[in-house]
């Protein structure tokens, strides 16, 4: 290793986006919300630990898979050209090996739950593996990512109730639209580069209606979660949280209105606070019951 060159360990941390926690927090908050809803309150430290660590591990594994799949495209995109796999600092074999280890660790956590959750974990893995390749063939790959990022909701209900009730599917549908909203903001950052290399994204598909599409997706997400949970939560705290989430969505719309790269990326990064707001509303609505 030459002087000043990053160590392998630091390169692996870059690969899994260790310094960018917003990505896994976007996965965590709806999953924890589902855990609290399925349990009608605090689900216990075992499940909180399993799903918190599992979310981090699987998102990290997904980064490894995504960077391997996209390495020939990423070198043509300003924001991703220096990623470890793309630059050659980490080999494809190393990235896949690290991803496999992380996925196996996550599966080890799932094994401490029940058979229904274990079965759903295979479906979640399949969607996770499919997403990087959807960007080549699907005009709205963000919808595929939405399913992948929402599987934790189904698994949370399965872990608590040993089944996946209709409520879980409603929450998954709503969450899918949230993912479309924030990942379209993300795609707006790279749109010029993606057009040159032939990558398919919702930002390209929506064209001049991209901002409207983002705002409509936010509205659908918040509406579905509000209507699905209003009877269950039965709390002014939850409704305040929904109002705050809506206010954040409107702010994001203001940020992206001019389609500036930095503002679109800022809106994307701040989305985890919107997710946290909804989770806090759910968790606090059960507090003290």
Curated annotation (Swiss-Prot):
User: Which Pfam families does the annotation name?
Assistant: UbiA
The protein's job, in short, is:
Catalyzes the prenylation of para-hydroxybenzoate (PHB) with an all-trans polyprenyl group. Mediates the second step in the final reaction sequence of ubiquinone-8 (UQ-8) biosynthesis, which is the condensation of the polyisoprenoid side chain with PHB, generating the first membrane-bound Q intermediate 3-octaprenyl-4-hydroxybenzoate.
What would be an example GO MF term here? 4-hydroxybenzoate polyprenyltransferase activity
For activity, the cofactor(s) needed are: Mg(2+)
Membrane topology annotation: Multi-pass membrane protein
Protein's UniProt name? 4-hydroxybenzoate octaprenyltransferase
Its cellular-component GO annotations read: plasma membrane
Lineage of the organism: Bacteria, Pseudomonadati, Pseudomonadota, Betaproteobacteria, Burkholderiales
Entry annotated with the keyword Oxidoreductase: no
Protein keywords: Cell inner membrane, Cell membrane, Magnesium, Membrane, Transferase, Transmembrane, Transmembrane helix, Ubiquinone biosynthesis
Pathway given for this chain reads: Cofactor biosynthesis; ubiquinone biosynthesis
**GO terms classed as biological process:** ubiquinone biosynthetic process
Q: Any idea where this protein resides?
A: Cell inner membrane
Q: Give the family this protein belongs to, as stated in its UniProt record.
A: Belongs to the UbiA prenyltransferase family.
Which InterPro entries does the UniProt record give?
HB_polyprenyltransferase-like, Prenyltransferase, UbiA_prenyltransferase, UbiA_prenylTrfase_CS, UbiA_sf
- Which CDD domains did the record assign? PT_UbiA_COQ2
Q: What is the catalytic activity of this protein?
A: all-trans-octaprenyl diphosphate + 4-hydroxybenzoate = 4-hydroxy-3-(all-trans-octaprenyl)benzoate + diphosphate
Q: What is its main location?
A: membrane
Tree of life domain: Bacteria
Q: What is its EC number?
A: 2.5.1.39
């Amino acid at each position: 290793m030459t002087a000043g060159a990053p160590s392998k360990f630091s390169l692996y941390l870059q690969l899994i986006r260790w310094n960018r926690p917003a990505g896994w927090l976007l996965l965590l908050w709806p999953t924890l919300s589902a855990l609290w809803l399925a349990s009608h309150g605090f689900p216990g430290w075992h499940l909180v630990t399993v799903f918190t660590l599992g979310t981090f591990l699987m998102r990290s594994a997904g980064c490894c898979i995504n960077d391997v799949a996209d390495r020939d495209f990423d070198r043509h995109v300003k924001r991703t050209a220096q990623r470890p796999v793309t630059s050659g600092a980490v080999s494809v074999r190393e990235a896949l090996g690290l991803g496999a280890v992380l996925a196996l660790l996550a599966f080890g956590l799932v094994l401490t739950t029940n058979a229904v959750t274990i079965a759903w974990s295979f479906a979640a893995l399949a969607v996770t593996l499919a997403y990087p390749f959807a960007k080549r063939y699907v005009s709205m790959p963000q919808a595929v990512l939405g399913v992948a990022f929402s599987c934790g909701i189904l698994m949370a209900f399965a872990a608590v109730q040993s089944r996946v009730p209709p409520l879980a599917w409603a929450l998954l549908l709503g969450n899918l639209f949230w993912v479309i909203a924030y990942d379209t903001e993300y795609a707006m950052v790279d749109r010029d580069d993606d057009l040159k290399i032939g990558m398919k994204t919702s930002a390209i598909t929506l064209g001049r209606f991209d901002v409207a599409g983002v705002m409509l997706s936010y509205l659908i997400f918040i509406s579905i979660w509000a209507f699905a949970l209003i009877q269950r939560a039965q709390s002014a705290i939850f409704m305040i949280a929904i109002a705050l989430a809506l206010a954040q969505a409107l702010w994001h719309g203001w940020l992206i209105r001019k389609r500036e790269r930095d503002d679109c990326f800022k809106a994307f990064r701040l989305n985890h606070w919107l997710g946290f707001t909804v989770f806090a509303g759910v968790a606090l609505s059960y507090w003290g019951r």
